[in-house]
Structures are given as structure tokens and as C-alpha cells.
């Protein structure tokens, strides 16, 4: 099971690389936000998960897979290019611009809310015009001028390269978050599930898989 960002931009490459090593491997990839993936893990619907937020360290093993960062995505137009030329950071635009938000329960939303608290702000202070559970739909809305959004740098990499979107670092030190591989502490994995976990915990194998995404 995988939450939205790893499920779209990381896990397919990981599983494809593992399948080359283990041709008999078969899997079903279930999607949800980070909270839903935790629930699926606890209920036994999945044995291995990928999430962008830690919520139950007493019951769940979290292995850091990927260092992601969150950026403020904006349309590539004259208005936002002027901010870029002035060296403006994303946090300076959060309270000023219409905002398209991820759904509550997503790792991205959790990371953003934690970040806002460090600034003495809350999500309620943003000019939220929509809550959307799909980064691809959010990117379309942002490029169409609906507002700005805080998204994974992974999610907007292609659009930034082709000039559809601009990506602003949130502040000088960047807003980082970790994508985790999760398993239940109390669960015994099958032989193939354990092989997958061991494969993903190998840094050089993981890097090769990430290059396929």
C-alpha cells in the first residue's frame, strides 16, 4: 500500500526493479493517503506500506527510504516570475495567494501543518479555494491559475522542467520530509515480502530503482 506521492512517483520504479530480480513476485498496489495506509497496515489488508508521515511509532517500524522536499508550486506567468526574480520564498506567498490544498490526512498536508506551526501560523489562515486529493489534478489547477499549492518536489519535477510551473523553495533551508517504508512490528512477513523489504533497504538498489521513475 502507498500514499499518494510515493505511490505515483517512487513505488512503481521500486517494484519494477524488484520484479527484475524476483520474476515470480506478484503484488497488488493499493493507494490512499498516509492515514489510510496506516489503517490498511494495522487491519492486515497490506503487509508493507509507503507513507510520507510518521503517526504510530509504537506499533509501526519506519525505515527512511527517500529524502523529499516540499515546494510552493505556482503558474509560470508574469506575476509569479516577478516574485522569482526578487528571490521570494514560498512561505512569503502562503498568506497572500489563493491556495489549493491537499486533503487532510495526507503526508503533504501533515508536513505543511507542522511547518506552519513553526511559523506561528495555522492552515485556517490560508486563502484555501479548494481541497484536492490528487497531485495531478492540483497541478492542472495551479497551471490554470486557480492558485498556488504546496507539493512534493517529486510531483512537480517534470512541469518545472518543461516550464509549465514554477517551484519556490519554502525558505532558505528548504522544507524537507521523509518518505518511509512501513511494516507492523508485530507482523511476521512472508519470505517474498521480507525479500522486498531487504531489497528496499539496500541503498544502491534503491538508487537504481529511483532512476527508473
Sequence positions of predicted segments:
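Central regulatory/effector-binding core of bacterial HTH transcription factors
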Residues: 1-58
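A late-sequence structural motif
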Residues: 10, 166-210
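Hydrophobic hinge/microswitch elements
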Residues: 33-38, 42-46, 51-52, 113-117, ...
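Alpha-helical segments flanking ligand/cofactor-binding loops in enzyme cores
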Residues: 38-39, 63, 92, 139-140, ...
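Flexible hinge/capping segments at coil-to-helix
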Residues: 60-100, 104
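Short beta-strand->loop
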Residues: 61-71, 127, 161-175
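Secondary-structure junction motif
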Residues: 81-84, 98-120, 189-193, 197, ...
Amino acid at each position: 500500500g502507498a500514499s499518494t506521492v510515493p505511490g505515483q512517483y517512487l513505488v512503481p520504479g521500486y517494484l519494477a526493479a524488484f520484479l527484475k530480480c524476483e520474476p515470480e513476485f506478484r503484488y497488488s498496489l493499493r493507494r490512499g493517503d498516509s492515514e489510510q495506509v496506516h489503517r490498511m497496515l494495522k487491519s492486515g489488508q497490506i503487509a508493507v506500506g509507503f507513507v510520507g508521515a510518521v503517526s504510530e511509532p509504537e506499533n509501526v517500524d519506519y525505515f527512511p527510504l527517500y529524502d523529499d522536499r516540499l515546494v510552493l508550486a505556482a503558474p509560470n506567468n508574469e506575476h509569479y516570475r516577478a516574485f522569482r526574480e526578487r528571490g521570494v520564498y514560498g512561505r512569503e506567498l502562503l498568506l497572500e495567494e489563493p491556495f489549493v490544498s491537499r486533503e487532510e490526512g495526507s503526508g503533504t498536508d501533515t508536513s505543511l501543518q507542522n511547518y506552519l506551526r513553526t511559523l506561528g501560523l495555522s492552515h485556517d489562515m490560508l486563502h484555501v479555494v479548494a481541497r484536492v486529493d490528487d497531485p495531478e489534478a492540483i497541478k492542472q489547477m495551479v497551471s490554470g491559475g486557480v492558485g498556488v499549492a504546496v507539493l512534493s518536489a517529486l510531483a512537480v519535477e517534470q512541469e518545472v522542467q518543461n516550464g509549465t510551473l514554477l517551484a519556490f523553495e519554502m525558505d532558505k533551508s528548504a522544507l524537507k520530509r521523509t518518505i518511509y517504508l512501513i511494516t507492523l512490528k508485530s507482523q511476521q512477513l512472508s519470505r517474498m515480502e521480507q525479500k522486498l523489504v531487504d531489497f528496499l533497504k539496500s541503498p544502491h538498489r534503491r538508487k537504481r530503482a529511483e532512476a527508473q521513475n
